[in-house]
Amino acid sequence: MRLLVSGKKDFSEFLNSLARRGESGFAKKEGTVRRILGAVKKDGDAALFRLTREFDGWRPSSRSIRVSPGEIRKAVKLLKEEERDTLEFAAERIEKFHLLQVQKSWSFADEDGTILGQIVHPLERVGIYVPGGKAAYPSSVLMNAIPARVAGVREIIMACPAPKGYLDPVVLAAAHIAGVDAIFKVGGAQAIGAMAYGTQTIPKVDKIVGPGNIYVATAKRMVFGEVAIDSIAGPSEILIISDGSGEPSYIAADLISQAEHDEQAAAVLVCTSRRFAEEVRSEVGKQLDLLPRKTIAGRAL
């Protein structure tokens, strides 16, 4: 992890490069993503299956690309008690939070009898994209599916890349707990295209939500208008500002928690004490040694 001091040349150079790091990413991927989306829109399942073979290394069919009820039951049975408790605890907290955000229809009649108001109607079908190529993200399942369910969305489908046809059981269990209606083993721009346009197997949705890599983000940007989207999320980033009085191990853990998502992630600490910065850097090194995703986090840091 680099240690930079304000006032020196390399400090301003680093800040400028950090600010520009996402500027050209979308443009470089647009051609590839446009071809993928066009193929899925034109050829449906045939293109989807071909792209899945190419990128995820397995041969799906209209039956195997959808997670079966038996696979979900098996995943739930494989959960350790601690994992189940953690997922259910998180799900309960997320639901409580979003219940307070629920909007309701309302109306009133003004002085001349004109009725004014607002009708709040949930979407029919929402598609959730959950990353899964390099790690499992059950939190992404809960944080996207539960708000949709609370809002009253009629049908929630989920797409998640499955290298060699494998999906992490914890992700499947999280989808079960969150009330996801259908899960598809497909990722990347092709998954976004399938949910945006619909195929013979995957239904068209009204809105696509959830994070992903640069190809997923570019695809979401390109299908916006065909469907609604939540946002165009770039690589993970975190900036911590400290006066040097915090706990170095906590700050190191927060930095690593974002750095492990992606080699392109940005994890930055700004503080007024060089001694404290060095303590945090030392702690980052110690914690990295214990991390299964040490290589990815190390590259980001």
Q: Which residue stretches match the model-derived regions?
A:
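Short, solvent-exposed amphipathic alpha-helical segments in soluble enzyme
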Residues: 143-146, 172-175, 200, 224-226, ...
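N-terminal small/polar loop signature for handling phosphorylated ligands or for N-terminal nucleophile
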Residues: 168-179, 196
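Conserved NAD(P)+-binding/catalytic subdomain of aldehyde/semialdehyde dehydrogenases
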Residues: 179-266
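NAD(P)-dependent aldehyde/semialdehyde dehydrogenase
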Residues: 267-301
